[in-house]
Amino acid sequence: MAQSKEQRVHDVFQSIYKKYDVMNSVISLQQHKSWRKDTMKQMDVQAGTSALDVCCGTGDWTLALSEAVGEQGSVIGLDFSENMLAVGREKVAAAKRTNISLVHGNAMALPYDDNTFDYVTIGFGLRNVPDYMQVLQEMCRVAKPGGKIVCLETSQPTIPVFKQLYFFYFKRIMPLAGKVFAKKYEEYSWLQESTLAFPGKDKLRDMFVEAGMKDVTVKSYTGGVCAMHMGIKPI
């Protein structure tokens, strides 16, 4: 019997957690940190606020949000892979952050009340969920009116030659890099599949609007291989 997307993704991340951070740097050619840093700048996170980081993985964005909201603020990182969360807990402990809670949960059914968070983020996780729209609607639901919902995700370049190189890299090079650096060829084959199947930036902008957000901002990075989408929950 074929695995569901949800089960396959869960198995992938339960397997690659030890090398996930290293492979992020390898696959993005060290760019993912600068993409996230600029996204945080665009978000203009205020001290004393609350944030939910959906599909938080090993917690890099969760930690960045924690620093931005400060001691008077609070951040929850949610992920469905216990192994990824275990790495995240080690990072939180090492950073001595007391305003972070890491929670095992499902992005498709967020265990929080409506209108709870000032910021709701998802970084390199939306492409892996079974239903993009359901997750976007859930993120919008738990955001406060006027709150920001932000997705940082791989995208698809539109420049012809660059687009061809991009597809070659993800189809051929990325799985091989996974085999060399993480000994996980099949798992990184899945990640390239999910990347190439993910909607382009214009389609994702439309999905943000359909999910209930307004004033959607889109910013592309590194020739369009990554994009930030930020929407506001109507007041």
Curated annotation (Swiss-Prot):
InterPro entries per UniProt: MenG_heptapren, SAM-dependent_MTases_sf, UbiE/COQ5_MeTrFase, UbiE/COQ5_MeTrFase_CS
Keywords: Menaquinone biosynthesis, Methyltransferase, S-adenosyl-L-methionine, Transferase
RNA-binding in keyword set: no
Annotated binding of S-adenosyl-L-methionine, by residue: T58, D79, N106, A107
Membrane-spanning ranges: none
Enzyme Commission numbers on file: 2.1.1.163
GO biological process, one term: menaquinone biosynthetic process
Top class in the EC scheme: transferase
Pathway: Quinol/quinone metabolism; menaquinone biosynthesis; menaquinol from 1,4-dihydroxy-2-naphthoate: step 2/2
Any one Gene Ontology molecular-function term assigned to this protein's record: demethylmenaquinone methyltransferase activity
Catalysed conversion reaction: a 2-demethylmenaquinol + S-adenosyl-L-methionine = a menaquinol + S-adenosyl-L-homocysteine + H(+)
Entry's family note: Belongs to the class I-like SAM-binding methyltransferase superfamily. MenG/UbiE family.
PANTHER family: 2-METHOXY-6-POLYPRENYL-1,4-BENZOQUINOL METHYLASE, MITOCHONDRIAL, METHYLTRANSFERASE
Stated role: Methyltransferase required for the conversion of demethylmenaquinol (DMKH2) to menaquinol (MKH2).
Name listed for the protein in its UniProt record: Demethylmenaquinone methyltransferase
Source species: Shouchella clausii (strain KSM-K16) (Alkalihalobacillus clausii)
Gene assigned in the entry: menG
